[in-house]
Structure formats: structure tokens, C-alpha cells
């Protein structure tokens, strides 16, 4: 039997591999989300200027 078993049942190497994939996927998602917000802001800003929406 193993001395150190994990709750999830995955090995340390598998956990590190999953973590690397998760982090890179999350960073890709964040890049897409930030780009979408920048494009939406350029199209139609959601905070009015000093003179309001006019």
C-alpha cells in the first residue's frame, strides 16, 4: 500500500499535468475575455463621459 494516497486518486505527476493544462486553459480564457471586453468597450462604452451619453 502507498504511504501517501490522495483523496482524488490521481498521482502527483497526473495532478501536475492536469494543473498545467488547467492553468494554460484559464489563461487562454482570460485573454479571450479581456479582448472581448476591449472590443465591446470600443464599440459601445458602458461608462458615460463627462457630458453624459450625449
UniProtKB/Swiss-Prot annotation:
Periplasmic topological domain residue ranges: 44-54
Gene3D superfamilies to which the protein is assigned, alphabetical: 1.20.5.250
Organism of origin: Rhodoblastus acidophilus
Annotated InterPro entries: Antenna_a/b, Antenna_beta_CS, Antenna_beta_dom_sf, LHB-1/5, Light-harvesting_complex
Lineage: Bacteria, Pseudomonadati, Pseudomonadota, Alphaproteobacteria, Hyphomicrobiales
GO CC annotation, single: plasma membrane light-harvesting complex
Signal sequence region: none
Entry's family note: Belongs to the antenna complex beta subunit family.
Cytoplasmic membrane side: 1-20
Name of the protein described by the UniProt record: Light-harvesting protein B-880 beta chain
Family annotation (PROSITE patterns): ANTENNA_COMP_BETA
Function, in words: Antenna complexes are light-harvesting systems, which transfer the excitation energy to the reaction centers.
Subunit: The core complex is formed by different alpha and beta chains, binding bacteriochlorophyll molecules, and arranged most probably in tetrameric structures disposed around the reaction center. The non-pigmented gamma chains may constitute additional components.
Cellular localization per UniProt: Cell inner membrane
Entry binding sites for a bacteriochlorophyll: 19, 37
Pfam families xref list: LHC
Amino acid at each position: 500500500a502507498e504511504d501517501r494516497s490522495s483523496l482524488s486518486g490521481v498521482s502527483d505527476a497526473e495532478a501536475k499535468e492536469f494543473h498545467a493544462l488547467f492553468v494554460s486553459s484559464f489563461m487562454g480564457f482570460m485573454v479571450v475575455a479581456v479582448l472581448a471586453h476591449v472590443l465591446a468597450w470600443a464599440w459601445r462604452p458602458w461608462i458615460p463621459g463627462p457630458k453624459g451619453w450625449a
